[in-house]
Every structure is written in C-alpha cells, then in structure tokens.
Regions:
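Fold-independent oxyanion-binding glycine-rich loops
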Residues: 23, 78, 91, 101-102, ...
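Internal helix-loop-helix
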Residues: 49-108, 112-117, 152
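Short secondary-structure junction/hinge motifs that connect adjacent elements
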Residues: 27-49
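Conserved "HGTGT" condensation-loop signature of ketosynthase/thiolase-family condensing enzymes
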Residues: 14
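Intrinsic disorder at enzyme termini
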Residues: 1-8
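Glycine-rich, Trp-frequent "lid" loop and neighboring beta-strands that shape
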Residues: 63-64, 105-152
Length: 152
C-alpha cells in the first residue's frame, strides 16, 4: 500500500512553495509583524488564486471538494514558506464546521462566500483566562468581537 502524497497533492504543494519563495521573505514577515497585521493581503490573495480557499468546500458550493489530507499537505507547504494567511481558520475549520453543523441555508450563504473570498473566518477557542467567560464576547450587528487567547 502506498502512503505518500498523490500527484495532485504534490502539484498543489509545489505551486504554493514556489509562490512563497517568490513573494514571501523574512523582511515581508517582519513588516507584517511591525504593522501589527495578522497576514499580508497580497500574499494571501496570491495563495487564494492557487485555489486554497475552496479546498474542502463541496463542489456543489463551488469548491474543490477535497479531503483533510489535502489540507494537511497545503498546511505543510504554507509552513515551509512561512505563508502568513488565515488558512486553518478560514479554509479548514470554518468549512468543516459549516458542512457538519450548518443548515442548508447557512451552507449556501457561507460556503459560497468562502470560495469567492468574500469572507474570512476566525475561530476562537479559549478565553483570555483559559476559562469560559462569555462576558468577554460582544456582538455588533452580525459580527462578533472580543478577545481570545487562541484565534485561528
């Protein structure tokens, strides 16, 4: 039995590595950190153009409908080139949560927006104190704001 990556997975990895080699550097990452940004929009948009945003989204919603192993291969490539992008939260955790727990209406609304790059999701999973404290969460309109120890 073969346990290596498929040709398609290797192709995706190679394209992302090449893009990051050409467009990301330590100097760029330092500038992002100095500007207090979480990611570089131009680098992120370039990686999105390679198709990562629709990776796990089913084809019926405009995505590629691939599996979590594909996401792991992409994650490895992003780490190789220090790709500062909201990959895990927006393109792995959010689609999985919406697919598994969302209504048909929510799937149509949000999965298509993930694929079209209209939205980016963040996933917070621990309060600043490490304990669950809903008083730190504020809702303004349909957006949640607040602080958390870990945001992906």
């Amino acid at each position: 039995m073969y346990f290596g990556l498929s040709e398609d997975q290797i192709f995706f990895q190679d394209n992302i590595k090449k893009f990051l080699e050409e467009n990301s550097s330590v100097d760029i990452l330092r500038k992002i950190a100095a500007d207090d940004r979480t990611f570089a929009k131009d680098i992120h948009d370039g990686i999105v153009n390679l198709g990562i945003n629709g990776l796990l989204v089913p084809e019926e919603f405009g995505g590629l409908g691939l599996d979590i192993l594909f996401a792991a291969a992409i994650s490895e490539s992003l780490g190789y080139g220090a790709g500062a992008t909201p990959f895990i939260g927006s393109y792995v955790m959010a689609p999985i949560a919406i697919i598994d727990g969302g209504s048909d209406e929510q799937k149509q609304k949000y999965l298509t927006k993930i694929v079209s790059n209209e939205v980016k999701f963040g996933v917070g999973f621990s309060a600043l104190t490490g304990a669950r404290d809903n008083s730190e969460i504020q809702i303004k309109g349909n957006k949640i704001s607040g602080r958390s120890l870990f945001i992906l």
